[in-house]
Amino acid sequence: MANAKGKVTQIIGAVVDVQFDGELPAILNALTTDNNGKKLVLEVAQHLGENSVRTIAMDATEGLVRGQEVTDTGAPISIPVGNATLGRILNVVGEPVDEGEPIVAKETRAIHQPAPEFNDQSTESEVLVTGIKVIDLLAPYAKGGKIGLFGGAGVGKTVLIMELINNIAKVHSGYSVFAGVGERTREGNDLYHEMIESNVIKPDNLEESQVALVYGQMNEPPGARARVALTGLTLAEQFRDQSGTDVLFFVDNIFRFTQAGSEVSALLGRIPSAVGYQPTLATDMGAMQERITSTKNGSITSIQAVYVPADDLTDPAPATTFAHLDATTVLNRAISELGIYPAVDPLDSSSRLMDPQIVGEEHYKVASDVQQILQRYKSLQDIIAILGMDELSEEDKLTVARARKIQRFLSQPFDVAKVFTGSDGVQVSLEDTIASFKAVVAGEYDHLPEGAFYMVGGIDEVIAKAEKMAADAA
C-alpha cells in the first residue's frame, strides 16, 4: 500500500526494523525516511511477526532514532534511466554524486526486473576483438557474452578492465555502463577523469557522452554494495532495449556484490553456508547474471572483474560466478612475478568461442599449438629445476626456447599503464596476432633473442627490437 506510514522500532547497523499499523509493504519495496535532512532509502528484506518488517539501509544509519516516521513508496527502488544519465555518476538509488544538476529523466525503472524470456534471447556467436593478443588468441570474448576476469589482490584486474574500456568503449559507437561495486573510491575518481580526458564523457555536452557511471564504493554500507550492480544493470538494460545496439557493461568487482550479500545475510540473522557465505549465494548470483543477456532487440556484453580470495579459485564466490560466463580470463600471480603483463594464464583461461566453427580452423590450430608448447614447458619445469637445461633432449630444448619466447610475446604494453611502463600502449589486430604466433610456433623466429619478444605489439616490432638490441650490443 503506497504512502503507508510506519515507525522505526530497532536499528542494528545497516538493518532497520519498521512497524506498520495496517498492511505491510511487499518484500523488496523501497521505504523512505528523513535522516537529519537527508533522504534515506530502506529496502524491505523480511516480514517479521507483530506487524514489523526488517529492512536494509542504502546509506549510513547514524543519526536515525527509534520512533521516526517511515513512508512506504509502494514500489521497489526506482532509478532514472536513458540519455539523461550519460556522463553522470549515480549512486545506488539513482541520485547524482558528481556535484552536478539533479537528473531529469523521461523514464524511471525498478532495479529488480525479471530476466528476458527464453524465446526473446539471441544465440548468435561473434568474436569481440579487444586488441590484446593473449585474449584474442587463446580465450576470445563473445559479442553479447559474459566475460570474467579472475585474479587475486594486485595482479591487474582493474588495469585490464581499464584497458578494455580504453580499447573497446572508445572505439565502440554504442553506450557503456560502468558499475563500481565495493572498490576503491580513488580508482572510481581516476576513471571519471580519464574518461573526460579521452572524450568519452563530454562535460560541456553531457547528452553526447557515451558512458554512465554507477558507484557504490568500499566505504558504503553493505545494502548499497549489494544493490549497486543491479542499478548499473538496469541502466544497461534500458540502453539495450531503447537503442537496439551492443551495450558494454563493466563491473568492478562482482566479488564485492557477493561479499555485501554475505554481510547483509549475517545482519538478517540467516545461518551461513560454506566458508561463511550466505545460503542464497547461487540464487543471488543467478538472479543478476541471468538478466545480463542478449535479446533480439540488442545485446549486453558484460566484462566483470572477479576478486579471488587468497588466490583460491575453488572458493564458493568465484566458483559460483564461473558457471555463468562465456569466457574466463584468469590472472596468475606467478606470471605477474615474471614481469609479464597482462598476467593472463594462457593455460587456465578459456572461452566457449574456441571452436573451429566459430573462430575458424587456422585460429583454432594456432591457439592449440601455442597451448601445447606452453603445457610441455610447464611439465618440463621440474626437470629443469632439478637437473638443469643440459639434461634435456635437443627437441625439448627447442620447445623450451619457443615456449619462453611465446610467454614473453603474450605480454603487451597498455595505454592505461603508460605511467608505470613509460611506453605507449599498442593494440594488435586479430589477423596480425594469428600470423605472428603461427610463425613463432613454426620456428621462423628461433634466431631472435628472447628479450626482443617482451612488451611489444606485432612481429614487426619484435624484429625491429631485435635489430636495435644487436646494434646496441655491437
Curated annotation (Swiss-Prot):
Localization annotation: Cell inner membrane
Q: What is its EC number?
A: 7.1.2.2
Family according to the record: Belongs to the ATPase alpha/beta chains family.
Q: Which residues cross the membrane?
A: none
Query: What organism does this protein naturally occur in?
Result: Ruegeria sp. (strain TM1040)
SUPFAM superfamilies in the record, alphabetically?
Answer: C-terminal domain of alpha and beta subunits of F1 ATP synthase (SSF47917), N-terminal domain of alpha and beta subunits of F1 ATP synthase (SSF50615), P-loop containing nucleoside triphosphate hydrolases (SSF52540)
Return the protein name: ATP synthase subunit beta
Gene that this polypeptide is encoded by? atpD
> A Gene Ontology molecular-function term?
proton-transporting ATP synthase activity, rotational mechanism
